[in-house]
């Protein structure tokens, strides 16, 4: 049902239906924003890039082939947008901590743990990091990652396993479940 719904939304968006465009943005905005944030580390820049992703998506909607998933197409655009961002900037991403509006101690602790994990993920080699972000943070299935990155499923499994090993070493834990 999801696939047909997305297909219908894309068809309506191509026809100029603003409501369909809005539904597509609402459906995927959070995931694409998180993806950008995990690569850019700046919430304002990530928001700008997310908007750029959707602008690109809608301006090139006529090129979209409906045999793939909308989500994967958006992640592809997001990946290219992030790469272009760094090509223009030519800076190494800063290790600034994200500012949070959370005030309770629990939220601060959770944010601290998440930031520690994110910093460890940033240290992974690029190919492994990309796979890890899609798997652990975006919660894509291994098969979806393989399709998105145009690699074999066995390579995705290897990269996820390698990411777990490297993260355990970086975070100094003995079992991945401790993370």
What residue ranges belong to the model's regions?
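Internal acidic/polar
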Residues: 3-6, 84, 91-122, 141
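A short pre-motif secondary-structure segment
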Residues: 131-135
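Sigma70-family region 2
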Residues: 14-15, 54-69, 88-89
